[in-house]
Amino acid sequence: LGVGADALSPFQVTWGRFFFALPVLLVAALVMRPRFSSPQWGWHTVRVTCGVSGVTAMFYAATLIPLADTTAISFLNPMFAMVLAIFILGEKIGPIRWSMAALALIGAMLLIRPGTAGFQPAALIALFAALVFGMEVVVLKLLSRTESPFQIILIANIVGAVVASAVAPFVWQAPTPMQWVLLAATAVLMVTAQAFFTNALRVGEASFVLPFSYATLLFAAFYDLALFNVVPVPLSLLGGLIIISSGIVLALRDGRAARKA
């Protein structure tokens, strides 16, 4: 969505993501005519706050560091969700989960590289995004106990559009015709991916579905190379591989535990 002086603010991109996704979801609601239950507005507010903050931070981080690095760091969100679930959901975490969380943290340190000449301060923004996305996952678990996936997605986009619309005027820059197209395309792609992912989790086991989400890193690295001519450094590749490996092990282990239960 532009570089240099022509680049749109991450807040404006976030606005586009929610604003243009909303009509798609409203049309889907008219076609599907789903049943709605009484929303838990307090938790929805927390979820939307995390979602808007996380999306904005991710967009901003991607303007400062390679897209592949931003994506890899974002995959820490299941680890953050695991830790937060202890305090919010009362879940108990075993030694294997803690080991995978520690391994993922090592991978993140390889990407961020604190205290070295290769230190990327902007990577901390992506780390913040992973943290709030982790919180969002925990809130989603709470909401899914009483509300349907479509209702959760629809409410999040309605509230997100309102919040983003309140912030956007302060950073507004008139988009070019192509940027309008890209804003709309970003929204449609993100809500479509969200719908596919939600339905995949509905019809398949999480342990089977979740590892496929890590293919995002491969696409991010490809887009870095194809669009921005950015080649990932070996240390970043290693850090990303460690994070992905720990996430896959955790997903597969949880799947086996669920089947035994």
What are these model-predicted stretches?
Residues 16, 71-76, 143-159, 194-225:
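Helix-helix packing/entry segments at the starts of transmembrane helices
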